[in-house]
Amino acid sequence: MYETYHSGWIECITGSMFSGKSEELIRRLRRGIYAKQKVVVFKPAIDDRYHKEKVVSHNGNAIEAINISKASEIMTHNLTNVDVIGIDEVQFFDDEIVSIVEKLSADGHRVIVAGLDMDFRGEPFEPMPKLMAVSEQVTKLQAVCAVCGSSSSRTQRLINGKPAKIDDPIILVGANESYEPRCRAHHIVAPSDNNKEEL
């Protein structure tokens, strides 16, 4: 006979901006609350677009959250009786978040992370690829391309209405004033100014 062990697991919600990641995170967390589970939510301090102490979707749905500056702060909280741990905008944390999430799940918690899988250049946005690899469940959501209306898997960064340059900083917190969803065909990354001088 096999022994069974009580262990947690990791759920990963990912996709482009405006694909409903935070909305899906909030939905899953609210289901946990409805089931009388103890739920704790964390979000990075850098994300202050809508509210400092709430995870807020672009549609305005919200859930209370603990604002943290770095991933290690999660472990300073007493999570002994917590059933479900939610972490939004996980791409804003360093790689330490991966080992923390794995420890939390090994300790019996259901851990739900949400964040971008690609940066504005269409390249993997660490640490999300690593989190996807260690997750028991991965949900990849798509938005609607702002240009053609097809499914979008990419996030277009716009600076004054023009595509961002490839050498622009990876992190720029913003919403629809700086970003829009795009399909592969309509996703544009402008060359750096240095490349123009070399041509």
UniProtKB/Swiss-Prot annotation:
Its main location: cytoplasm. The keyword Transcription does not apply. It holds the Pfam family TK. ATP binds at G15, S16, M17, F18, S19, G20, K21, S22, D88, E89, V90, Q91. GO terms for cellular component: cytosol. Its EC number is 2.7.1.21. Keywords: ATP-binding, Cytoplasm, DNA synthesis, Kinase, Metal-binding, Nucleotide-binding, Transferase, Zinc. It comes from the Bacteria. It is found in: Cytoplasm. Zn(2+) binds at C145, C148, C183, H186. InterPro entries: P-loop_NTPase, Thymidine_kinase, Thymidine_kinase_CS. One of its GO terms (molecular function) is zinc ion binding. The active site is at E89 (proton acceptor). The keyword Nucleotide-binding applies. It catalyses: thymidine + ATP = dTMP + ADP + H(+). One of its GO terms (biological process) is thymidine metabolic process. Homotetramer. Belongs to the thymidine kinase family. This is Thymidine kinase. It comes from Staphylococcus aureus (strain Mu50 / ATCC 700699).
